[in-house]
Structure formats: C-alpha cells, structure tokens
Curated annotation (Swiss-Prot):
The chain crosses the membrane at residues 10-29. It comes from Schizosaccharomyces pombe (strain 972 / ATCC 24843). The keyword Transmembrane helix applies. It is found in: Membrane. It is a single-pass membrane protein. Keywords: Membrane, Transmembrane, Transmembrane helix. This is Putative uncharacterized protein C9E9.01. The keyword Transmembrane applies. GO terms for cellular component: membrane.
C-alpha cells in the first residue's frame, strides 16, 4: 500500500462441529477510505470505518461452507460486526463467544 502500513492476521476457532475463521486486514496511513476486498475463498465482507475489513467464514463438519450471517453457527461474525475500530484489537474471542 502506497500511503501506509498494511497488517494482516488470521484467527481460527475450532468447535466440535464448526471451524470459525476470521481474517483481519488493518490499514494505517493517510487513507481513511473504506477498503473493499474480493476473495472467492472467503465468505461475507464486513466493511468498518477507517480502513478495517473483516472476513468471517464457517465450515461445517461435512466441509460445506455456510453463509457468514448464519447466527446459529457464525457468532463470531456478529461480535466482529458490532465491534468498534478502537476496541477491535482488544477482543478476546474465546471469552466473548458463548458457544
């Protein structure tokens, strides 16, 4: 990225039947525009302010991908969608998610 620093992180939480994967891309720099991403291997794109974007995907035990807004199986999506930019990095996923 020409105008700043690009950071990325990946977090996977494995339960008995579902694997939750969160992809986080953080952009620090002059640009405050919303960043839009496209990746056919990842589920829904959640656009947040100041250059944050979060991907959430869920994979069932049978290997079938589900929609990221399926609240029954993708609670991580809800937590990250509702989080604020400055609070995002402080989230402890394992303690915040009620499986």
């Amino acid at each position: 990225m020409a105008d700043g620093l690009e950071l990325s992180a990946e977090l996977s939480v494995h339960t008995g039947t579902v694997t939750h994967t969160i992809f986080v891309y953080v952009f620090l720099g002059k640009s405050k525009r919303l960043k839009t991403f496209s990746d056919s291997n990842v589920g829904s794109v959640i656009k947040l302010e100041a250059g944050f974007a979060v991907w959430s995907r869920c994979e069932a035990a049978n290997g079938e991908w589900m929609e990221a807004d399926n609240e029954d199986r993708c609670r991580l999506y809800q937590i990250y969608r509702e989080s604020k930019l400055k609070e995002f990095a402080r989230y402890n996923v394992l303690s915040r998610v009620n499986w």
